[in-house]
Amino acid sequence: RYYSHRFYSFQAAAISENANTQSEQGVMLRVEAKPWEGVNIVSYVDFFADYWPRYGMTTSSNGQEFMLEGKFEMPHSHLLSLRYQMKRKAANDVILPLHRIKAQWTFTGFEKCKLQSTASVHLSSGTNPGFAVSQLAQASILRNRALRLSFVGAYFNAPDYLTRVYIYEPSLWNSSASYSYYGHGLRIATGISYTFPHSHWIIEAKYSLTHMLDRHTISSGHQEILSSNKNDISIQIRMEY
C-alpha cells in the first residue's frame, strides 16, 4: 500500500484502514459465505502497520481489525443485519481496543418507500459506551420517481471522541452521507430531489438540525456557535447528459 507524495485523486479509495490512500503495510483476509438461502455472512481480518509516526504518535505503530456481519432476508421484504467489529489501534502511544456492535432492520415492502431502523453501540476501555439509534424513511413519488423525499431522525449519546458514533443520512449527489457525532444530542435531516421532466436538470435540497443536550455552544474558535442548535441548508442544481 504505497502512494507517492505526488499522487492525488478526488474520490480515491483503497483497501486500507478507513479506505484512505495512505502508505502502510498490511495484510487482509476476507471470507464470504451463503450457507442457506437468504443468509449471507461476511468476515474479514486485517493486520496493518505504519513505520512512520501517524498523527498523535511519536513512534511507529501497528494494529488489527476484525469484522463479522450477518444479513438475514425475511419474508415480506424484511432484512435484518447484525455486525460486530473490533479494532486494536495505537493512539497517543497506547493501543486501545474498540468494539462496535450494530443492528439494522430494513423494510422495502412498498414499491416506492423504504424504512430503516439502526442501533449501534461503541465500547472502549476506560470510558463509558457510546450509542445511537436512528430512523430513516425514503419515498419516491410522481412519474418515473421524479420527486424523491428522505427523512432521518437520530438520538446519540457518546461521552468522548473515542466512542463517537456514525449516523448515515441521504445527502446531496457527490457528497458525504455518513457523519460522526459525540456528546449528547439529536440529529434531524430531511432532503428533497426533483428531476424536471423531458429535461437534463435536477435540483436537490437538504436541511439538517443538530441539537445538543449537554452544552450551550457548538464548536470553538472562529467557528463557535453560541447556541445548542446547528442548522445547515444545502442546495444543488446540476445538469446531466
State where each predicted segment sits.
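Exposed, low-structure sequence patches enriched in small/polar residues
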Residues: 1-241
